[in-house]
Amino acid sequence: MVAKILDGKQIAKDYRQGLQNQVEALKEKGFTPKLSVILVGNDGASQSYVRSKKKAAEKIGMISEIVHLEETATEEEVLNELNRLNNDDSVSGILVQVPLPKQVSEQKILEAINPDKDVDGFHPINIGKLYIDEQTFVPCTPLGIMEILKHADIDLEGKNAVVIGRSHIVGQPVSKLLLQKNASVTILHSRSKDMASYLKDADVIVSAVGKPGLVTKDVVKEGAVIIDVGNTPDENGKLKGDVDYDAVKEIAGAITPVPGGVGPLTITMVLNNTLLAEKMRRGVDS
């Protein structure tokens, strides 16, 4: 069998059209979602990613701004800018682009974001709400993964799902989302023993560790669904996933490519959460 290719670009395009329709409906009520992104320093990858978010937001009718601070900005300066955005009623959602310079505590900054504007879903309050099944902002990559699975009509109930990676950004939250869909979830990590035995029994594999070639054909069950979150540049700058794509697609039931799989959905869910933030604070039903 040859796997169905889960085209994240097309899924994202369709989803963004739905978001655009909702933004237009919200504007008719007098409300326009606004996304503000704080960028500290001149890291090329961060600048490119932030510009992509701004462009995507504006394309569906949102307002977006980049607040660019110098590489030498102090923690206090970043906190002051963040506090201004927290108190600005025109701002629906706030993102702080990471990594931050070494003189700025990432944790302190993320905890200073107003939880009601935390569209990355990284604030401890929002993480806690996710784990007690309250409505909240869910981290964008896990949310995008779930949309891919939904779009592909993957029934997760009772299925064995293996998540490789335990980060607070992807591994742990996507495990919780899979649990909410009644999957039986196993989390593997760098200290796990005999990973192959778990992978061979998995109906769904989500790999998010940034190790090219980690998931090989010999550990994948025929017909399994493979979600590859890895995006490690090789020596030529080409992005590589965690999965041996060419070999695994010959046996998997469905698979995401890299690039063009999960990535487009991550930015899409930033927009989704910004829209949700505006609706929640204006008392508009989702």
From Swiss-Prot:
Top-rank taxon of the source lineage equals Bacteria
Keyword list, A-Z: Amino-acid biosynthesis, Histidine biosynthesis, Hydrolase, Methionine biosynthesis, Multifunctional enzyme, NADP, One-carbon metabolism, Oxidoreductase, Purine biosynthesis
| Reaction it catalyzes | (6R)-5,10-methylene-5,6,7,8-tetrahydrofolate + NADP(+) = (6R)-5,10-methenyltetrahydrofolate + NADPH; (6R)-5,10-methenyltetrahydrofolate + H2O = (6R)-10-formyltetrahydrofolate + H(+)
Pathway involvement? Answer: One-carbon metabolism; tetrahydrofolate interconversion
Please give the biological process terms from Gene Ontology that the record holds.
L-histidine biosynthetic process; methionine biosynthetic process; purine nucleotide biosynthetic process; tetrahydrofolate interconversion
Q: Which residues bind NADP(+)?
A: G165, R166, S167, S190
EC?
1.5.1.5, 3.5.4.9
Q: Provide a GO CC annotation, any one.
A: cytosol
Q: Which GO terms describe its molecular function?
A: methenyltetrahydrofolate cyclohydrolase activity; methylenetetrahydrofolate dehydrogenase (NADP+) activity
**Pfam families for the chain:** THF_DHG_CYH (PF00763), THF_DHG_CYH_C (PF02882)
NCBIfam families xrefs: PRK14175.1
* Oligomer and partners: Homodimer.
- Give the protein's recorded name: Bifunctional protein FolD
User: What gene does the UniProt entry assign to this protein?
Assistant: folD
